[in-house]
Amino acid sequence: LLDEIEARNDFVLLLADPEPTPWTRRVSRHCDELLLLADAQAEPAIHPIEENCLLRRAPLAEAAEILVLLHPEGTQCPRGTQQWLDRRPVADHVHVRPALDRDMARLARIQSRTAVGLVLAGGGARGFAHLGIYRALQEEGV
């Protein structure tokens, strides 16, 4: 059934159980990418699901593991990220404030491969022009 659903859709989101269960193990074996959601204010200890379903996965499981650190709405500058990354072999990580629509939209763009990156170079007066470009892009929701 999962193969049929995947054949008909570009993206399929499977939600694992909050505890290690047969469904959670199946999800961890079947997916192309795993989003590990974690409260950034919690201790960065390995969760039982990570221990049972991810760290013990078969070597052929090629799913990229992405750590999504969830922050309170008022967080300006995330801290303690390295403690999370030191404990788990993830392919990437992203910081998200779930209360902010723009953060959730950014996560959706990243996952759907439609994210936009911005690279600016130069200094002096160009730096002020860069700020203007950045603000204009933000105002347009890019």
Where are the language model's segments positioned?
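Patatin-like phospholipase
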Residues: L1-F11, E19-V142
